[in-house]
Design a protein with these regions (language model features):
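A bilobed periplasmic-binding-protein/Venus flytrap-type ligand-binding module shared by bacterial periplasmic
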Residues: 2-3, 81-99
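Solvent-exposed loop/turn segments at secondary-structure junctions
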Residues: 7-9, 58-61, 94-97
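Short helix-initiation/N-cap motifs at beta->coil->alpha
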Residues: 26-43, 128
């Protein structure tokens, strides 16, 4: 799971998320990676080199405002799997549906049991659309 060095708080959140995934989805063998900036994150995601990323709400809003072309590329090549209070877990369109389901269900279970930091927070004004599987698996 990658994040950008320029996205404040994303790396610590990613590391915490990996601890939770190691507990609830150990077969994923999740690891953290940091990219130098939004451009590199978008490149790695869109070319399927690293299919998952954590980005903050602020980072995404700033990217849309400061580099609309890069935001458009990210928007076209990604979908949201899970939304937290201040962060989003996104993936590319190549990520297998069974992996989406496993991650969503594991995080939802972790939040219900004891990990408030991964509580799902539905966003109405989402910049990157949810994967349809999210709505099938999580009842709103």
């Amino acid at each position: 799971i990658m994040c950008s060095k320029k996205d404040e708080g994303a790396f610590q959140f990613t590391k915490n998320l990996i601890v939770i995934l190691d507990e609830y989805l150990p077969e994923a063998k999740a690891r953290a990676a940091r990219t130098r900036d939004a451009e590199r994150l978008t490149d790695l995601l869109s070319t399927n080199q690293i299919p998952l990323a954590i980005i903050s709400n602020n980072f995404l809003v700033n990217l849309q405002r400061e580099d609309s072309n890069l935001f458009k590329v990210l928007f076209e090549h990604s979908k949201t799997l899970y939304t937290f209070k201040d962060m989003l877990l996104i993936t590319n369109h190549h990520f297998p549906e069974q992996h989406v389901i496993a991650i969503v269900e594991s995080l939802f279970k972790a939040a219900k049991e004891k990990h408030d930091s991964v509580t799902f927070v539905k966003k109405a004004n989402l910049k990157i659309n949810y994967d349809e599987v999210v709505f099938q698996k999580l009842k709103f």
